[in-house]
Amino acid sequence: MFTMKKSLLVLFFLGTISLSLCQEERNADEEDGGEATEEEVKRSFLTTFKDLAIKAAKSAGQSVLSTLSCKLSNTC
């Protein structure tokens, strides 16, 4: 019973230390990443532009397909 308590204490201690180290690293990352760099701004702009272009292409493709299906089935 004593050895089981001892091993549980060791596991708890090691878990607490690793959790503490992760918290310190997270705090350091938050302090460093306060301002967006120029590359991050460009990347976010390009991602937004790409998403808008994809949505426009899907919309155009759907309208072309609906027009073609209408003309092929002579229901226009």
From Swiss-Prot:
Keywords, comma-separated and alphabetical: Amphibian defense peptide, Antibiotic, Antimicrobial, Cleavage on pair of basic residues, Disulfide bond, Secreted, Signal
Tissue specificity: Expressed by the skin glands.
Disulphide bridges, residue numbers: C70-C76
Tagged with keyword Kinase: no
Gene Ontology BP annotations: defense response to Gram-negative bacterium; defense response to Gram-positive bacterium
Cellular location(s): Secreted
Propeptide positions: 23-41
Domain of life: Eukaryota
Pfam assignment, any one: Antimicrobial_2
Signal peptide: 1-22
Stated family: Belongs to the frog skin active peptide (FSAP) family. Brevinin subfamily.
Role description: Has antimicrobial activity against Gram-negative bacterium E.coli ATCC 8739 (MIC=12.5 ug), against Gram positive bacteria S.aureus ATCC 6538 (MIC=6.3 ug) and B.subtilis ATCC 6633 (MIC=25 ug). Has no activity against methicillin-resistant S.aureus ATCC 43300 (MIC= ug) and fungus C.albicans ATCC 90028.
Protein name from the UniProt record: Brevinin-2ISb
Organism: Odorrana ishikawae (Ishikawa's frog)
